[in-house]
């Protein structure tokens, strides 16, 4: 948590779910896409503190996509197509996790939970060539 003192209010815009999570269509460049910046640095930690989210009072919030830390309902992931597009991608690509998430969110919805207890890992990417994003080259 080397970013815990790096407060970035401009990246902490959040929309809470009021009621059940619902399907949404999210595309690169849309207003909803901007939600992804919430998962940089220690933003989720700061947001949890600001909104007084606790394990006894968790909050569901709208997401675009979440890097690294995510859980799927396996049945819903498969119903949305899962990662069946894998063979259509070139060997050097990125964004397959984003592609799968966008498909699940469009069919079933998706949310983040505060407090998450999971924070930015600060590891360097193992994908050096990130020129091909799956969600940009394949049909969503």
Q: Where on the chain are the PLM-derived regions?
A:
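Conserved donor NDP-sugar-binding/catalytic core segment of glycosyltransferases
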Residues: 1-37
């Amino acid at each position: 948590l080397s970013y815990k003192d790096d407060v970035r209010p401009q990246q902490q815009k959040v929309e809470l779910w009021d009621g059940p999570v619902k399907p949404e269509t999210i595309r690169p460049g849309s207003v909803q896409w901007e939600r992804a910046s919430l998962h940089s640095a220690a933003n989720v930690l700061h947001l949890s503190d600001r909104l007084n989210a606790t394990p006894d009072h968790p909050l569901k919030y709208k997401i675009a996509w979440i890097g690294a830390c995510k859980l799927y309902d396996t049945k819903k992931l498969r119903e949305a197509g899962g990662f069946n597009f894998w063979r259509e991608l070139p060997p050097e690509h990125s964004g397959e996790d984003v592609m799968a998430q966008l498909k699940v969110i469009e069919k079933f919805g998706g949310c983040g939970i505060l407090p998450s207890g999971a924070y930015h890992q600060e590891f360097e990417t193992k994908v050096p060539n990130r020129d091909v994003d799956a969600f940009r080259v394949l049909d969503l």
